[in-house]
Structure formats: structure tokens, C-alpha cells
């Protein structure tokens, strides 16, 4: 029997190395088997990259990370060019191995005790009025990273103008839910976001280590202690789910008092990741948006390129995002 591979702290595992560690086997997709992207998924590149380069340089100079880059988001050029970014705290190595995600897996380094202050100063210098903070999963920390989130929220508000809004996209705090909620109810964001990602039938394949009901409970329990804070979640489609399954998840979210929802197309980061089952037509996204409005979501963004933090400021303001 072979011994498990011991990974040194700080070493990033990606693609085939990362997929080899998950409980469900993912067979690499041959190039000729990959579905061709339809026209509605083509991303327009900006005429100038000056603003993009400025934001990247600001992050590099302070040792900060953006989920836009680490997760290979297709909207990076648009968002960076508009001076917005979603910051990823607690390092760039995740303790989970989700086969849909392009973030590296491994043994993370200890959290940077100066990250919160550096983040606050960077956001102040960027002069943004809406910021999204997310993180890798940190199952190695006693509180799952909740206190670090709280420290970042505090520092952002201390260094920025009073009208800045902060949205957090948190992990599931597996085994540490109440500890995390107790911490974040005191240093609350303006929007508390946690993504369900997919339908419960696909959790074993797409979210190994996560639990559908646990994620729902996290959203509901935070709403119970901070009813004044908007809650939000996100879903990917194109993994093999049915429309009926998505609608059931949407109903579950409303039953757990979730206010806002994003729905977007899953895009395969590499041939080693879980393959795209199908590309969902924009008309179907619109049907889901209409259904969400009828269910009572205060805001729902549904479209092929929609992501949790895509135009998050407009989402929070109630404007249409597709």
C-alpha cells in the first residue's frame, strides 16, 4: 500500500496533481472532446490594459491576491478595467480540492498578520466604494479564518470613507459554523455571501468535503443573528444538473431566508477539471431570473458570464446584471 504524498507548506498543486487527490476520478478531457464555446460566451477585451496593469501592480506591491486571477475568471479584463476587484485573503492555497475550481490546493502558509491592514490601505488608495472579500478554504484554522475576515472588514472601514460597502464571500466554515457566526455578527459586512455552487445530487462529484444542508444552514443562521444584513448565494449551471433541480435549490435558498442569488455558466479551467456537460442558452438564464423574482429574491443576476462578484456593486444596488 502506497503512502500518501506529503506536500510541503506553500507548495501549490494544480490541474492533474490536484485532481489526483479527490475521491471521485476525473478523466482528463481530450481536446477534441471539449465542447466548443458558443458565441454568447465570447469576452470582449478592453482597448487599453493600463487600468488592469495598475490594479495588478497595486496588489503585487502589497502581497495581495485577487480571486479574479487565481480562479481564472473570464470577467477579469472588464472588472479590472473598471477599477473593481475581488480580493482573496488568507493566501492563495486552498485546503479543499473542488474539481470545478482553478485555485491551487495544498498546505497553506500561516495567515499574514499584516494582511488586513495592507488590504485596507490598498482599497483606500484604489478609491473604490464597493469591495468583495473572499478566501480560500482554511480547514487548518480553528475558526476557519473567520477572525481574519472580521479584521479585514474592520481595517477596510477604518481606512476608507464611511460610504464604502463590503461584501464577503465566505467558505462553509466546516465544523466551525457557530464560532464563525459569533465572530462575524460583531464585525458584519453589508452582504454575507456563501455559494452553494451546484445541486445536491452533484455535490460528491463537484464539492467533495462540502455538505449541501450545512451550507444552507450557514446562510440561514447568519440571517437569524443579523437580520439587517443581506444574504446571498451563487450557482453554476452546465455541470449536468436539470432545470428542475436548479429551481428546487432556488426554493431551498428562499426557504432559508437568502435574499440575493447569482447564476452563471460553469467553464472548465483545464482538461483535468470536471467537464462542461452543456452550455446553457441565455434564454434559459432569463427564465431562471424570472422564476427567482417570482420566488421573492430581492435581486437575482442570471447570465452566462455572471459570477458572484461580477458587478457586485450593481447587484447590491438592485440593478440588472446579466
From Swiss-Prot:
Annotated binding of [4Fe-4S] cluster 1, by residue: 68, 73, 79, 309
Domain of life: Bacteria
One of the Pfam families matching this protein, by short name: Radical_SAM
Key words, A-Z: 4Fe-4S, Cytoplasm, Iron, Iron-sulfur, Metal-binding, S-adenosyl-L-methionine, Transferase
Name used for this protein in its record: Lipoyl synthase
Residues forming coiled coils: none
Family statement: Belongs to the radical SAM superfamily. Lipoyl synthase family.
Keyword 4Fe-4S set for record: yes
Organismal lineage: Bacteria, Pseudomonadati, Pseudomonadota, Gammaproteobacteria, Alteromonadales
E.C. number(s) listed in UniProt: 2.8.1.8
GO cellular component: cytoplasm
Cofactor(s) listed: [4Fe-4S] cluster
Recorded catalytic activity of this chain's protein: [[Fe-S] cluster scaffold protein carrying a second [4Fe-4S](2+) cluster] + N(6)-octanoyl-L-lysyl-[protein] + 2 oxidized [2Fe-2S]-[ferredoxin] + 2 S-adenosyl-L-methionine + 4 H(+) = [[Fe-S] cluster scaffold protein] + N(6)-[(R)-dihydrolipoyl]-L-lysyl-[protein] + 4 Fe(3+) + 2 hydrogen sulfide + 2 5'-deoxyadenosine + 2 L-methionine + 2 reduced [2Fe-2S]-[ferredoxin]
Subcellular location per the Swiss-Prot or TrEMBL entry: Cytoplasm
Entry binding sites for [4Fe-4S] cluster 2: 94, 98, 101
Cofactor binding description: Binds 2 [4Fe-4S] clusters per subunit. One cluster is coordinated with 3 cysteines and an exchangeable S-adenosyl-L-methionine.
UniProt cross-references to CDD domains, sorted A to Z: Radical_SAM
Matches recorded under SMART domains: Elp3
Keyword check for Transport: no
Enzyme category, top tier: transferase
Pathway: Protein modification; protein lipoylation via endogenous pathway; protein N(6)-(lipoyl)lysine from octanoyl-[acyl-carrier-protein]: step 2/2
MF annotations from Gene Ontology: 4 iron, 4 sulfur cluster binding; lipoate synthase activity; metal ion binding
Domain Radical SAM core: 80-298
Amino acid at each position: 500500500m502506497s503512502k500518501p504524498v506529503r506536500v510541503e507548506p506553500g507548495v501549490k498543486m494544480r490541474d492533474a496533481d490536484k485532481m489526483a487527490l479527490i475521491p471521485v476520478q476525473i478523466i482528463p478531457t481530450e481536446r477534441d472532446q471539449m465542447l466548443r464555446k458558443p458565441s454568447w460566451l465570447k469576452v470582449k477585451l478592453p482597448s487599453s490594459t493600463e487600468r488592469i496593469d495598475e490594479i495588478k501592480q497595486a496588489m503585487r506591491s502589497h502581497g495581495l491576491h485577487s480571486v479574479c486571477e487565481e480562479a481564472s475568471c473570464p470577467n477579469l479584463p472588464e472588472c479590472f478595467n473598471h477599477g473593481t476587484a475581488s480580493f482573496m485573503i488568507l493566501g492563495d492555497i486552498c485546503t479543499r480540492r473542488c474539481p470545478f475550481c482553478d485555485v491551487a490546493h495544498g498546505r497553506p502558509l500561516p495567515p499574514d498578520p499584516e494582511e488586513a491592514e495592507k488590504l485596507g490601505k490598498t482599497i483606500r488608495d484604489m478609491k473604490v466604494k464597493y469591495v468583495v472579500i473572499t478566501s480560500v478554504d482554511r480547514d487548518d484554522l480553528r475558526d476557519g479564518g473567520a477572525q481574519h475576515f472580521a479584521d479585514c472588514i474592520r481595517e477596510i472601514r477604518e481606512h476608507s470613507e464611511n460610504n464604502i460597502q463590503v461584501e464577503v464571500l465566505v467558505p462553509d466554515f466546516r465544523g466551525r459554523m457557530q464560532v464563525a457566526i459569533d465572530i462575524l455578527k460583531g464585525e458584519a459586512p453589508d452582504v454575507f455571501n456563501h455559494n452553494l455552487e451546484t445541486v445536491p445530487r452533484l455535490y460528491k462529484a463537484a464539492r467533495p468535503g462540502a455538505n449541501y444542508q450545512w451550507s444552507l444552514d450557514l446562510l440561514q443562521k447568519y440571517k437569524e443573528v443579523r437580520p439587517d444584513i443581506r444574504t446571498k448565494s451563487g450557482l453554476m449551471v452546465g455541470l449536468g444538473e436539470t432545470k428542475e433541480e436548479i429551481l428546487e435549490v432556488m426554493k431551498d435558498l428562499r426557504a432559508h431566508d437568502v435574499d440575493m442569488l447569482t447564476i452563471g455558466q460553469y467553464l472548465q479551467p483545464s482538461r483535468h477539471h470536471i467537464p462542461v456537460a452543456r452550455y446553457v442558452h441565455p434564454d434559459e438564464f432569463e427564465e431562471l431570473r424570472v422564476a427567482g423574482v417570482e420566488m421573492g429574491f430581492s435581486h437575482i443576476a442570471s447570465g452566462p458570464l455572471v459570477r458572484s462578484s461580477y458587478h457586485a456593486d450593481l447587484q447590491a444596488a438592485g440593478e440588472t446584471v446579466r
